[in-house]
Amino acid sequence: ASAKYSAVVGGGKNTASGLSAFVGAGCGNTASGNNAAVVVGGMSNTASGLSAFVGGGCGNTAAGKGSVVVGGSNNITCGGHSTVGGGACNTAQTEDSVVAGGRCNITCGDHSTVGGGLNNTAADSGCWATVAGGCGNTASTSGFVGGGMANCAKATNCWATVPGGCGNCACGGGSTVGGGKANCSLATVATVAGGCRNDASTDFSFVGGGCCNRILTCGDTIAGGKENRSAGGCAFIGGGLTLSANNVFDIIGGGCGNRTCSDTTYGGYSFIGGGKDNVTVCGA
């Protein structure tokens, strides 16, 4: 203990070099912060930030002002008042950010949180992002990813949500992908509830499930099915295969290969209940 009011209680090769610094025990620990840095124990831990704290573990560093590493190994807190609870190789880079545990997780935006898992990133841009767990997930400004694998909630104007699944992406403001695989909601308040390779690319659009369904105009709905396409505006497809709703307020309940007229002058408000290869005639 080399600084005023500093103390090393026990252990070996410990150093308390900051004003009012404290090392409780362990081996090779250093408390060097400007004021009141603390290392309770463990091995090769460093508290270098003002009033920084390391509880234990191995190779942990609390470098931010008032930052905390509770335990684990090779964890780092760089942001002021940031926290890493445990795990390994986690980094809380920014102000008031938290990594609770897991491995190789990182918070890049202020007030962001990673609960656990592996290789997750909260707020690669912006702040207030949350990744609860999973693997390889990313959340940006005010975005939320619950879990799963390789999901992203990356809206530039906030509030994108992906609770789970694999390879899903919510990129529009207030957009949601509930789960499934390789689904995308790309516009404001667009939603894909589940399924596989579905695309809600316009504002206020909705895909319930199924596979390879695509919405191209605002306010459209595809409840399910496969390879259906809605491009009408407030149009609806219930389910089925290779259905196409092409004009405003068109409805196709189901079936296979059914399509409505695409003429914007004479089409619209068409209805096909089901069947196969049915077509509504424009102006009829």
For each of these PLM feature ranges, what is it?
Residues 1-284:
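Periodic small-residue-enriched repeat registers in elongated scaffold domains
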